[in-house]
Amino acid sequence: LRHSSAASDVYKRQNMIFGLKQAKVSKEKIEEQLEKVSKFLQVDALLERKPSQLSGGQRQRVAIGRALVREPRIFLFDEPLSNLDAKLRVEMRREIKKLHQQLKTTVVYVTHDQTEAMSLGTNIAIMNHGVIQQNDTPENIYNKPSNTFVADFIGSPSMNLIKGKLKQNSDKVYFIASGSNFEIPINGYDFKEKNNLDNKEVFFGLRPEHIFFKRSDEKDFEMTLRADLSEYIGHEQIMTFDYSNQEVLAKFPSTFKIELGKETKLFFDLSQTSLFDAKSEERI
């Protein structure tokens, strides 16, 4: 399903049953399906209207109804919300989520919108130039991205990727940012392979929401970075800090007052760390 209406002069009743008529389904079955689906989608009072008389959300529901009456085993949604305004996209996203839960039918949903993918998907395949980068649950996509492309694609702002190298001392491993001597311990990290890590060039990944202005856990790692920029977006602010000439973004409540140009004490939740090989850009 992509476009929310067919020809503009076709009444919605005819629009919804078009596929059944083409398949030469009996009139009785057509009326039965039309009544059941239109009530389910709450568009039964709209069937005698033309597309120009309906709202964007109503047109989208009728388009879904046109597919539903045929009782498919799999739905393909090809960017169905791309032509809707922001408010209506949110409303229709909820509608599609409810529909999926009620029908318990397989849905293949194509979108460039990460919010749609994360909120609707039970399994997400992220593609780049036609190649699947990661096929996983939304939770694993967010918490354990398979490479820097996925890490950068998911999240707003996306994951901080700080370039540096690892230092291995016996069973202890540290991250040192390029141009810095400061060591960040990452002993709890789940490495795929823990051999030959010393001097390995990597990207240290940590999401902005896992950096805190106030300590949230005793295990949080304390850092002091210079605050360079503040972006106020209502209930929260996005702060940019300097870490060895690399930008680090963090999300804080807008009520927190942070002075720009000053050194600020921050706390990193290192349990949320991701590490990527600097050459292959794959998770290690």
What is the role of each PLM region?
Residues 157-159, 168-284:
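Non-catalytic connector elements of ABC transporters
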Residues 68, 156-158, 162:
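Elongated periplasmic alpha-helical coiled-coil
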Residues 137, 149, 163-165, 224-226:
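Residues located in well-ordered beta-strands
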